[in-house]
Amino acid sequence: MKVLDLLTVLSASSLLSTFAAAESTATADSTTAASSTASCNPLKTTGCTPDTALATSFSEDFSSSSKWFTDLKHAGEIKYGSDGLSMTLAKRYDNPSLKSNFYIMYGKLEVILKAANGTGIVSSFYLQSDDLDEIDIEWVGGDNTQFQSNFFSKGDTTTYDRGEFHGVDTPTDKFHNYTLDWAMDKTTWYLDGESVRVLSNTSSEGYPQSPMYLMMGIWAGGDPDNAAGTIEWAGGETNYNDAPFTMYIEKVIVTDYSTGKKYTYGDQSGSWESIEADGGSIYGRYDQAQEDFAVLANGGSISSSSTSSSTVSSSASSTVSSSVSSTVSSSASSTVSSSVSSTVSSSSSVSSSSSTSPSSSTATSSKTLASSSVTTSSSISSFEKQSSSSSKKTVASSSTSESIISSTKTPATVSSTTRSTVAPTTQQSSVSSDSPVQDKGGVATSSNDVTSSTTQISSKYTSTIQSSSSEASSTNSVQISNGADLAQSLPREGKLFSVLVALLALL
């Protein structure tokens, strides 16, 4: 068997395959391992199984075996632990490898990795499609100063100038952050957050554009049975007496830029336009994937892209709803508190275009001297007539005997004699417009238009005058629901006025 064919099936870098064009004898172990990763090429065969779509984003720390990847059961050792993943080549023919259980159709990947050392030892992290599109990141153990980037389109190896080398500080001794951003218009390779290479989709050598799975593993490019070109590229012949050779992966982040359950080749053109997303769309979650990646790269977590979108939407809706409710409540409270509309009128009905019903204003009076039906209503004539909560407003009294005094947070003067010290509560509760009137200490609250009957006034005034006739200068103390106490002394003239009003009411 040709080593070129063997390496292609193994999904190893096509750059390596280029140097392996010469014939060589492959071992039975290598042949068996190679056949286990063989896939159906939809550009050459019909009826290939659709590719399972990732259609989400995730971060994997490999503290235990991962649901996202399958151990290909090649010879070698794979361990999981608190420090992440280790893949060890302990002897000849070992080739520990993990393959993703999903495909992405464009996406972004990040790996925190320390490459294996050792002459001829190759550490690999790459994307590959069923029709042999490929995007690579590779390290050779004998070179502790750089890593390599490469790409291929449809397995085309007619030219060999696709690979590039990038300087990096001791990659076999230190962990570094390597990132691939495979977008529709370009692919970008990053080292520790810095762009080191950009490939445009207008490349004359083609551009990867079909669904790809993720592979990672370690193998011996310097095996003495390999072609001379492969051994040279890998840095020389591998000395297995120096084994074991281990590569380490601390974390992997993967995002898919597309949505759907499966990706299918619609024809044999191999173009991205021919790819069909079952139940989704190509590039349908690009923006969401960027958000997911940012969260995951900063140590955050998400359950899935759909959950993330739903959560963001729900959160936004909740925030808006909360803000609106808070604003309405605050506005209503502010309106009632700042409206100084002490009004003396005949069976007057105070109305408002506002539908807010702060009917929970439950001020109580310890000593009610002029306890007419002092009514708090959410129906304020207009927001435009509001004054600040600390403002005072003088309202002329009416000649009628029936009074409706709208409660206010600050004293207001009626005919320059009577002052109301009744203030509505500043805390609003959700009470429907048809909720019953709450009466505490002679202060009635209702969201309906309020009227004060002659009988109510007469009764209340009479009762009040009798209970407080001995108190010439008593304090009218009002207990507001938030615990604040306000007290004002009612002038003597005010009492006389109250008596006069009560007598008129009896006529």
UniProtKB/Swiss-Prot annotation:
Residues 381-439, 451-477 have a biased composition (Low complexity). It is found in: Secreted, Cell wall; Membrane. Its EC number is 3.2.1.14, 2.4.-.-. Chitin binds at residues 138, 219, 230. Optimum pH is 3.5. Keywords: Cell wall, Cell wall biogenesis/degradation, Disulfide bond, Glycoprotein, Glycosidase, Glycosyltransferase, GPI-anchor, Hydrolase, Lipoprotein, Membrane, Secreted, Signal, Transferase. PROSITE patterns: GH16_2. Residues 1-22 form the signal peptide. The keyword Transport does not apply. Induction: Positively regulated by cell integrity signaling through MPK1 in response to cell wall perturbation. Induced by heat stress. The GPI-anchor is attached to the protein in the endoplasmic reticulum and serves to target the protein to the cell surface. There, the glucosamine-inositol phospholipid moiety is cleaved off and the GPI-modified mannoprotein is covalently attached via its lipidless GPI glycan remnant to the 1,6-beta-glucan of the outer cell wall layer. Pfam families: Glyco_hydro_16. A lipid is attached at residue 482 (GPI-anchor amidated asparagine). It is a lipid-anchor; GPI-anchor. Disulfide bonds join 40-48. Its main location: secreted. GO terms for biological process: carbohydrate metabolic process; chitin metabolic process; fungal-type cell wall organization. GO terms for cellular component: cell periphery; extracellular region; fungal-type cell wall; incipient cellular bud site; side of membrane. Dual chitinase/transglycosylase that plays a role in cell wall architecture. Chitinase and transglycosylase activities are coupled. Required for the polysaccharide cross-linking at the septa and the cell wall. More specifically, transfers chitin to both beta(1-3)- and beta(1-6)glucan in the cell wall. The minimal number of intact hexopyranose units required in the molecule of the acceptor oligosaccharide is two and the effectivity of the acceptor increased with the increasing length of its oligosaccharide chain. Present with 44000 wall-bound molecules/cell in log phase YPD medium. This is Congo red hypersensitive protein 1. It comes from Saccharomyces cerevisiae (strain ATCC 204508 / S288c) (Baker's yeast). The lineage of its organism: Eukaryota, Fungi, Dikarya, Ascomycota, Saccharomycotina. The gene is CRH1.
